[in-house]
């Protein structure tokens, strides 16, 4: 009975706290929505420019006119770009070139990458039977894409790799990320959105590199992409891992 009275007495205050929390979060949500809208607008404009460059100088005016005519229909806009640049590969090229340009114009729009240590030096030394006489060893183990991947979302790319040194000390490495669009038995490399290449200084052990790849709103269901992750250290040739994924409904 006492607990019930206490809950009844606290109810108005809890309601006030909850309302205050929502009000406090509201500006952050609005700011994020505003940033997303600005990024989307930038990408659309850059897509028009990229498409026009491929189709000829006079295409800018024509595409702009079509976009104005269909300004309320994003699906039609996407179809116009896709038709102008030539199918799935052309659309992907225009989109990722555009988004890379927009990231460079405003770096705050670019999703941050994350590097996380997943196994210690000693753990990995036992697992792979590493010997100090091997010197510096850097290997890309695997790439995973969190499913499902849908249009108008971000594909989470997790790349696992390890670096071993004779004494477990830190060493400099370079990671490289690549993105390809696959059509039939062919694939075409497109601009990787964000940091395609990044230098790191890491201690011996296993690491997981996480980045997010934006997927265009107008991407067709069934579109296939391949991501590639490379790691290089001590001037040696890079070690590579890759993963193919499909955009679903």
Feature roles, as predicted:
Residues 39-109:
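Short, low-complexity, glycine-enriched hydrophobic/amphipathic alpha-helices that associate
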Residues 133-174, 179-181, 206-210:
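Contiguous beta-strand segments within globular domains
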Residues 230-241:
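Short acidic/polar inter-strand loop motif in beta-rich domains
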Residues 199-203, 212-221, 234:
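Short, surface-exposed loop/turn segments at beta-strand-coil junctions that are enriched for proline
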């Amino acid at each position: 009975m006492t607990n019930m009275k206490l809950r009844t007495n606290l109810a108005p205050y809890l309601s006030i706290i909850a309302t205050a929390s929502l009000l406090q979060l509201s500006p952050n949500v609005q700011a994020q929505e505003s940033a997303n809208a600005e990024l989307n607008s930038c990408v659309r404009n850059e897509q028009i420019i990229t498409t026009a460059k491929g189709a000829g100088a006079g295409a800018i005016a024509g595409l702009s006119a079509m976009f104005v005519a269909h300004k309320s229909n994003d699906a039609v806009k996407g179809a116009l770009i896709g038709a102008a640049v030539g199918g799935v590969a052309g659309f992907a090229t225009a989109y990722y070139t555009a988004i890379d340009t927009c990231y460079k114009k405003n770096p705050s729009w670019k999703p941050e990458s994350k590097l996380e240590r997943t196994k210690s030096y000693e753990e990995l030394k036992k697992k792979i039977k590493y010997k100090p006489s091997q010197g510096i060893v850097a290997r890309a183990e695997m790439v995973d894409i969190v499913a499902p991947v849908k249009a108008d979302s971000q594909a989470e790319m997790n790349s696992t790799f390890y670096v071993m040194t004779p004494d477990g000390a830190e060493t400099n490495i370079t990671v490289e990320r690549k993105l390809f669009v696959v059509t039939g038995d062919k694939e075409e490399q497109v601009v990787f959105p964000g940091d395609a290449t990044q230098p790191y200084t890491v201690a011996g052990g296993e690491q997981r590199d996480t980045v997010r790849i934006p997927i265009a709103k107008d991407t067709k269901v069934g579109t296939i992409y391949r991501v590639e992750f490379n790691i290089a250290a001590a001037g040696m040739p890079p070690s590579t891992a890759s993963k193919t994924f499909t955009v679903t409904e």
